[in-house]
UniProtKB/Swiss-Prot annotation:
Entries under Gene3D superfamilies matching the protein: Transcription elongation factor, GreA/GreB, C-terminal domain, Transcription elongation factor, GreA/GreB, N-terminal domain
Stored InterPro entries: GreA/GreB_C_sf, TF_GreA/GreB_CS, Tscrpt_elong_fac_GreA, Tscrpt_elong_fac_GreA/B, Tscrpt_elong_fac_GreA/B_C, Tscrpt_elong_fac_GreA/B_fam, Tscrpt_elong_fac_GreA/B_N, Tscrpt_elong_fac_GreA/B_N_sf
Function: Necessary for efficient RNA polymerase transcription elongation past template-encoded arresting sites. The arresting sites in DNA have the property of trapping a certain fraction of elongating RNA polymerases that pass through, resulting in locked ternary complexes. Cleavage of the nascent transcript by cleavage factors such as GreA or GreB allows the resumption of elongation from the new 3'terminus. GreA releases sequences of 2 to 3 nucleotides.
Similarity-based family: Belongs to the GreA/GreB family.
Gene it is expressed from: greA
Keyword Transcription regulation: yes
Pfam families noted in UniProt: GreA_GreB, GreA_GreB_N
Protein name, as recorded: Transcription elongation factor GreA
Keywords: DNA-binding, Transcription, Transcription regulation
Phosphoprotein as UniProt keyword: no
A GO term, aspect molecular function: DNA binding
One BP annotation, GO: regulation of DNA-templated transcription elongation
Signal peptide, first to last residue: none
Organism encoding this protein: Maricaulis maris (strain MCS10) (Caulobacter maris)
Length: 157
């Protein structure tokens, strides 16, 4: 069973989504199915079919979240330190072609949000930075060709 790395914040977000699905979404869709059944012929009842489809999605997502949480390897980044890039690190890099600095935090799959600077541990740029230190150059095979990023700083928390 493969562990899924995530930050404490990532675990909390998945827990909250699971709780919302179980306590709010699931009962609401059951009520919608019940109400749609009262409208008679189910074969041509669009409300019923939409509610059943929504129920299937909710149940699938509940199972997915329960599985991810069961396999979670929660990493408390506030207890980490050092200049080596690892999961949870916030890394400032310098694009050697454009001289533009960017800052990324390396997080779990479900936490990634490029717009807010959070990149997945499995993304090419994150994989290229892992185990590098300040001053090292990470090379990434990007769609436009090879990109080189110098690690400027590594911080935690």
């Amino acid at each position: 069973m493969n562990k899924i790395p995530m930050t404490v914040a990532g675990q909390i977000a998945l827990d909250e989504e699971l709780k919302r699905l179980k306590t709010i979404e699931r009962p609401a869709v059951i009520a919608a199915i019940s109400e749609a059944r009262e409208h008679g012929d189910l074969s041509e009842n669009a409300e019923y079919h939409a509610a059943k489809e929504r129920q299937g999605w909710i149940e699938g997502r509940v199972q997915e979240l329960e599985d991810k949480l069961a396999r979670a390897q929660v990493i408390d980044i506030t207890k980490m330190s050092g200049d080596t890039v690892k999961f949870g690190a916030t890394v400032t890099v310098l694009d050697e072609d454009t001289e533009q600095e960017s800052t990324y935090q390396i997080v779990g799959e479900d936490e990634s949000d490029v717009k807010s600077g959070k990149i997945s541990i499995s993304s090419p740029i994150a994989r290229s930075m892992i185990n590098k230190e300040v001053g090292d150059v990470a090379e990434v095979n990007a769609p436009g060709g090879l990109k080189s990023y110098e690690i400027m700083s590594v911080s935690w928390g």
